[in-house]
């Protein structure tokens, strides 16, 4: 049960981190569009929260695999596995594309923004499938 508590807290924090990242990302976009200097703390905060999100989804992946193998002995009991792997992939793609954003790589920013838009729906789906998995464990 303690493992699922860690997972629940981690998922809540991951969703919160995503919200903060959306806010800081929109803020950076606003300052760029206005051609005005952004606050010096904004980009480091965005990167730091991004690193936290990557860490949280990797922790969630580990908990999911260990917990499912420990409880069932194998994986693939629900769509939650595919949803979780999709979220991990999107978060990693977002993180890698973020490191590539520069005037020399005009493809990186649209990839980063689009990935994060898709991630919104993936997080909603993985949250829903996760809720159904938790109900299985509680029954």
Where are these regions (language model features)?
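Membrane-embedded alpha-helical bundles that constitute the cytochrome b-like, heme-associated redox core
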Residues: 1-139
């Amino acid at each position: 049960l303690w493992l699922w508590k860690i997972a629940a807290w981690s998922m809540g924090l991951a969703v919160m981190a995503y919200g903060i990242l959306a806010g800081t990302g929109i803020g950076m976009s606003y300052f760029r569009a206005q051609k005005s200097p952004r606050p010096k703390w904004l980009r480091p905060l965005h990167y730091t929260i991004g690193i936290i999100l990557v860490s949280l989804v990797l922790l969630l992946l580990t908990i999911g695999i260990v917990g499912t193998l420990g409880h069932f002995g194998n994986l693939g009991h629900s769509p939650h596995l595919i949803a979780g792997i999709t979220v991990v992939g999107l978060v990693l793609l977002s993180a890698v594309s973020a490191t590539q954003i520069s005037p020399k790589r005009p493809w990186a920013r649209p990839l980063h923004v689009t990935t994060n838009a898709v991630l919104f729906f993936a997080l909603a789906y993985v949250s829903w499938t996760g809720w159904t998995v938790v109900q299985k464990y509680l029954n």
